[in-house]
Amino acid sequence: MTGVPVSRIRNFSIIAHIDHGKSTLADRLLQETGTVSAREMRPQLLDSMELERERGITIKLQAARMNYRAQDGQDYVLNLIDTPGHVDFTYEVSRSLAACEGALLVVDASQGVEAQTLANVYLALENNLEIIPVINKIDLPGAEPERVIAEIEQVIGLDCSGAILASAKVGIGIQEILEAVVQRVPPPRDTVAEPLRALIFDSYYDAYRGVIVYVRIMDGEVKTGDKICFMASGREYEITELGVMRPNQEPVDALHAGEVGYMAAAIKSVEHARVGDTITLVNRKAPEPLPGYKEAKPMVFCGLFPSSSDQYAELKEALEKLKLNDAALYFEPEISSAMGFGFRCGFLGLLHMEVVQERLEREYNLDLVITAPTVVYQVTLNNGSVIRVDNPSKLPPPNERTSIEEPIVRVEVILPEEFVGTVMELCETKRGTFKDMKYLAQGRTTLVYELPLAEVVTDFFDQLKSRTRGYASMDYQMIGYRADDLVRLDILINGDVVDSLSTIVHRDKAFYVGRSLVAKLRELIPRHQFEVPIQAAIGSKVIARETIPALRKNVLAKCYGGDVTRKRKLLEKQKEGKKRMKAVGTVDVPQEAFMAVLKLQND
């Protein structure tokens, strides 16, 4: 033990929208408390992944322990638990907030409250955290701290009389923030005597020690060598190492209630140590686990195929390695008639999907082909059983099912009021249902719509940004499933269904999507020696067709004059050959055609 009583421990996190300066603020706090020497300091110290620093987002959680001597002369231990700010990782945010007693709400003085900040603030309020508003970037010429404070009070309803004006970049207000954490964030409850309960708020895989679990000890204490049990999975392990993060790991002998640290116990996979699970001792089990544990369910699926088949084994190995660190990633082998061998992968959301794809391409040098993202549909069969369908080609035929339900999300958009019209129009075209609209301070508005997730996953975000010149921010939450008139649109090339091009669309949009798809494919598929029909069909009913004409060789070139029957014979022979070729010939569908389908769905 570090010799600090529980009453002098403070656990807090930082809530902020992307780019509002959360990581820079964390850096300043580490410097101010002397946790990191000037020599070790580098920007965004807690964002350890190269991709995180480049995109400026925090994906995996980090934690750091700081020793701070306050103005009252006492030594305090401050545990900063970093949170990812992005909507796909809401569950991870909620777990890291559950590990704290307080939170700094960081808002950019020139931007104001954004949608994702709101979502995370609500999570913090659900966990009864003490929230300290911090208005960051007040050194910017466009900073309007008074407007932003008024907006926070109006939108969130927080009392901002004690809001701290700061600039993490220049170092203004850092001392005040540390003092506010000491004075306003309540200390953890002193429950050392109770049975051990530790909340896992993050875990990652280490090649030498197995899975390293980041925990907040809620009740009791734990020592190196103790036998522990994970309450959700029931697995038992022996602790090989305990320690605290200053951001680098430092081993200690024991951790007590209120402390934040890490433990290693030769755990083989991150799946066995799920975020939100409760750890307790084998010989003195806690009567019940900590509340709030949920299995992470993938919401968006897509096919990943290596562009050359000899990379299949490498792709499999790369996915397995990513899975060690990312329990929410799901994948299973898939065979496609057009693309060969690959994997069907499931993700939490769009950003999660992009990050995984980018990491596969960047860290493992893979060249990937990605099919259009789809969502999970619930299909009720004639016998009353319900199945989940994540791949359009697996949808049962119409005579075997009674209904298809699609996932619906509640989307909250915060935007300047002059763009309200175009954004409402966008939501209407995406089959949205209008729910609510509020005017905020200074000409900003929140819109709330219910939209099918399938319409959001393709390109809703990009279109939203382009229609509002980048000023809108959005956040979405799953609210459940709803039945609708959905059909599977198949693409037939030369009479054969190409499974990778099948999509599930709303019946009202099927004709439009089918027509534009076949027109696009006609441009991309090269001409063959025989004519190739491209059809879009719902079941057996063809709703759109284009034909690629055959390449024609002039068989009469060698006939000079001569009898017409001779020419006719050659033409008939060519016609017969074409017929035979059409019956046995295969159509080569180039890679660009599949990419075009993705782009088309985004238009």
UniProtKB/Swiss-Prot annotation:
One of its GO terms (molecular function) is GTP binding. It is found in: Cell inner membrane. PROSITE patterns: G_TR_1, G_TR_2. Its EC number is 3.6.5.n1. InterPro entries: EF-4 (IPR006297), EFG_III/V (IPR035647), EFG_V-like (IPR000640), EFTu-like_2 (IPR004161), G_TR_CS (IPR031157), GUFP (IPR027518), LepA_C_sf (IPR038363), LepA_CTD (IPR013842). Keywords: Cell inner membrane, Cell membrane, GTP-binding, Hydrolase, Membrane, Nucleotide-binding, Protein biosynthesis. It catalyses: GTP + H2O = GDP + phosphate + H(+). Pfam families: EFG_C, GTP_EFTU, GTP_EFTU_D2, LepA_C. GO terms for cellular component: plasma membrane. It is an enzyme of class 3 (hydrolase). One of its GO terms (biological process) is positive regulation of translation. GTP binds at residues 19-24, 136-139. Coiled coil: none annotated. It is a peripheral membrane protein. Residues 7-189 form the tr-type G domain. Required for accurate and efficient protein synthesis under certain stress conditions. May act as a fidelity factor of the translation reaction, by catalyzing a one-codon backward translocation of tRNAs on improperly translocated ribosomes. Back-translocation proceeds from a post-translocation (POST) complex to a pre-translocation (PRE) complex, thus giving elongation factor G a second chance to translocate the tRNAs correctly. Binds to ribosomes in a GTP-dependent manner. Belongs to the TRAFAC class translation factor GTPase superfamily. Classic translation factor GTPase family. LepA subfamily. NCBIfam families: lepA (TIGR01393), small_GTP (TIGR00231). PANTHER family: TRANSLATION FACTOR GUF1 HOMOLOG, CHLOROPLASTIC, TRANSLATION FACTOR GUF1-RELATED. This is Elongation factor 4. The lineage of its organism: Bacteria, Bacillati, Cyanobacteriota, Cyanophyceae, Synechococcales.
